[in-house]
Regions:
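Enzymes that bind and transform nitrogen-containing heteroaromatic metabolites
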Residues: 1-221
Length: 221
């Protein structure tokens, strides 16, 4: 089995299982309670992992507010296949955990120096190797992935998701064949089914439901 952190994902989904509209607008369809839950889940993580598109769409700083008194600020890990990042983005200009940039398929002439000069650590390797490195070299025991869908799909293809946290917003329906789900746009099936058990079910008065699912590890005997 691969050496990697325990990996959690956290998403808000609509009644019809969408994470955003067809236009990929930022997900602002949930309540303040959902934001509070997001931050509580972040406090469990040694590192946060997002795709570059999600980082830019949601204007994330990938931090935990000081008033929540986090023991640490998690490492901030951002994935871009070609390794292009916007140095004016606030993630490079806010106090927080060290920024780790993963270019999983860099072009031959790739130059990481501008990002290194901005204080980031740049990795050029496949996602599976990056996960191994986070666990073995950076002591990341718990990694929280906050999207987007293509990154979650890549984790699912590696069978590298241990816990799924969802805020199910039953008050909102987006519809649309092209609106993304937690694994992105509709596409081919995963290589194999992944079995999860519902471990937390918490309906709120506002039409939202907090759900947690744990990966069931089937014995391979």
């Amino acid at each position: 089995p691969m050496t990697r952190p325990r990996i959690l994902i956290n998403f808000a989904i609509t009644a019809d299982g969408k994470t955003s509209t067809r236009a990929k607008d930022p997900a602002h369809f949930t309540s303040k309670l959902d934001l509070h839950r997001l931050l509580e889940i972040r406090k469990r993580a040694d590192a946060i992992l997002v795709g570059r598109g999600t980082l830019e769409a949601d204007e994330m700083s990938m931090t935990i507010p000081a008033e929540l008194k986090p023991e640490i600020q998690p490492l901030r890990c951002i994935v871009s296949r070609g390794g292009k990042f916007d140095l004016s983005h606030k993630v490079f200009n806010t106090q927080g955990g060290t920024v780790h940039l993963l270019s999983s398929d860099p072009p031959p002439e790739y130059n990481p120096r501008p990002y290194q000069n901005a204080g980031a650590i740049v990795h050029q390797c496949p996602l599976v190797d990056f996960l191994h490195r986070l666990r073995t070299e950076y002591n990341v025991e718990t990694l929280l992935c906050e999207g987007g869908g293509s990154l979650v799909r890549a984790l699912a293809e590696l069978d590298a998701i241990d816990e799924v946290n969802l805020t199910w917003a039953t008050h909102t329906i987006f519809g649309g064949e092209n609106a993304p789900s937690i694994t992105g746009a509709l596409g081919p099936h995963l290589p194999a089914s992944l079995e999860f058990a519902l471990t937390h079910f918490e309906p709120l008065d506002n039409g939202e439901v907090f759900l947690t699912y744990e990966r069931l590890k089937t014995s391979t005997t």
